[in-house]
Swiss-Prot record:
Residues 4-234 form the ABC transporter domain. Changing G137A: Loss of maltose transport. Has greater ability to decrease mal gene expression than wild-type MalK. Keywords: ATP-binding, Cell inner membrane, Cell membrane, Membrane, Nucleotide-binding, Sugar transport, Translocase, Transport. It is found in: Cell inner membrane. Part of the ABC transporter complex MalEFGK involved in maltose/maltodextrin import. Responsible for energy coupling to the transport system. The keyword Iron does not apply. It comes from Escherichia coli (strain K12). It catalyses: D-maltose(out) + ATP + H2O = D-maltose(in) + ADP + phosphate + H(+). This is Maltose/maltodextrin import ATP-binding protein MalK. Changing A85M: Suppressor of EAA loop mutations in MalFG. InterPro entries: AAA+_ATPase (IPR003593), ABC_transporter-like_ATP-bd (IPR003439), ABC_transporter-like_CS (IPR017871), ABC_transpr_MalK-like (IPR015855), ABC_transpr_MalK/UgpC-like (IPR047641), Mo/tungstate-bd_C_term_dom (IPR008995), NA-bd_OB-fold (IPR012340), P-loop_NTPase (IPR027417). Its EC number is 7.5.2.1. Changing S322F: Resistant to inhibitory effects of alpha-methylglucoside but retains transport capacity.
Length: 371
């Protein structure tokens, strides 16, 4: 195991900057997930750690050693890619041992490591098979095993589940989580799938256009996003946003006017520092935090546009006439409502988020469980 530290790391191709002044501390044994939309720089960041991309400026440390100029093979890292990249003419055992053979490891060492890793990954009964005789999930486990037998101090995974179907992704996600708990290795995992990030990570790094938008535990990012980008990216369905105007402030409270015909005002328990009366801001509320109208004091009303029945839950898309914008309301169980009907939902102030015009969040003061 080893820690990984990035200090003011920047990557540029000519005048195009793809990673901007990245500062990160990844502790020994942590499972850290880099997440963000396509083009945010997450894979580039992973490749700089692996040594497959040069660092334009800044410093990378693995353990106590500065690694900027160290060749990839000498960094003590192992990498699993989106593509399995298995040799089709070699057996599972031969694929897993290929790197060790090239490194000149003794036969008994190779056999011992391959057998140990095969047991961990439930591949022992498949060691003599060729890749064409394996399922997608089994092939991905072989690719992971090939990296594990080298015993890297840092394990890098670049969207390893992207080629799998939905059921296999869930299965492999569970297996990777178990593998980390069993081995305790430092793992850095890249994905665009925020569900993978939330379920796997000890710590999530959200990237936006080459910069670190926020670093934190999964529930911390979900309940206390640093800005509107993180709020909209973490969570599915994504957070609803409403334009509001500040009408008053007090200690640890901000009053805003909702975009409804009755101009209803509501006090939100958020930090009021630097918030000016009259400012235009965005109120955020997650679909699952909206309430049935009969148990709420603050009511939003609109016309049902779409009803999505998922069996275990219902998602209702409601158009708010005054802003010509849809809100998504999610409720567990079945909700029977017709498209075109008028539908009212409740807005709980303690679950609301408030964002300034520049996108930064006013810190929520409501204490959420698990954070």
């Amino acid at each position: 195991m080893a820690s990984v530290q990035l200090q003011n790391v920047t990557k540029a191709w000519g005048e195009v900057v793809v990673s901007k002044d990245i500062n990160l501390d990844i502790h020994e044994g942590e499972f850290v997930v880099f997440v963000g939309p396509s083009g945010c720089g997450k894979s580039t960041l992973l490749r700089m750690i692996a040594g497959l991309e040069t660092i334009t400026s800044g410093d990378l440390f693995i353990g106590e050693k500065r690694m900027n100029d160290t060749p990839p093979a000498e960094r003590g890292v192992g990498m699993v890619f989106q593509s399995y990249a298995l040799y089709p003419h070699l057996s599972v055992a031969e694929n897993m041992s290929f790197g060790l053979k090239l490194a000149g490891a003794k036969k008994e060492v190779i056999n011992q490591r391959v057998n140990q890793v095969a047991e961990v990954l439930q591949l022992a009964h498949l060691l003599d098979r060729k890749p064409k005789a394996l399922s997608g999930g089994q092939r991905q486990r072989v690719a992971i095993g090939r990296t594990l037998v080298a015993e890297p101090s840092v394990f890098l995974l670049d969207e390893p589940l992207s080629n799998l179907d939905a059921a296999l992704r869930v299965q492999m996600r569970i297996e990777i989580s178990r593998l980390h708990k069993r081995l305790g290795r430092t793992m850095i995992y890249v994905t665009h799938d925020q569900v993978e990030a939330m379920t796997l990570a000890d710590k999530i790094v959200v990237l936006d256009a080459g910069r670190v938008a926020q670093v934190g535990k999964p529930l911390e990012l979900y309940h206390y996003p640093a800005d509107r980008f993180v709020a909209g990216f973490i969570g599915s369905p994504k957070m609803n946003f409403l334009p509001v105007k500040v009408t008053a402030t007090a200690i640890d409270q901000v009053q805003v006017e909702l975009p409804m015909p009755n101009r209803q005002q509501v006090w939100l328990p958020v930090e009021s520092r630097d918030v000016q009366v009259g400012a235009n801001m965005s109120l955020g509320i997650r679909p699952e935090h909206l309430l049935p109208s009969d148990i709420a004091d603050v009511i939003l009303e609109g016309e049902v546009q779409v009803v999505e029945q998922l069996g275990n839950e219902t998602q209702i898309h409601i158009q708010i006439p005054s802003i010509r914008q849809n809100l998504v309301y999610r409720q567990n169980d079945v909700v029977l409502v017709e498209e075109g009907a008028t539908f009212a939902i409740g807005l709980p102030p303690e679950r609301c988020h408030l964002f300034r015009e520049d996108g930064t969040a006013c810190r929520r003061l409501h204490k959420e469980p698990g954070v």
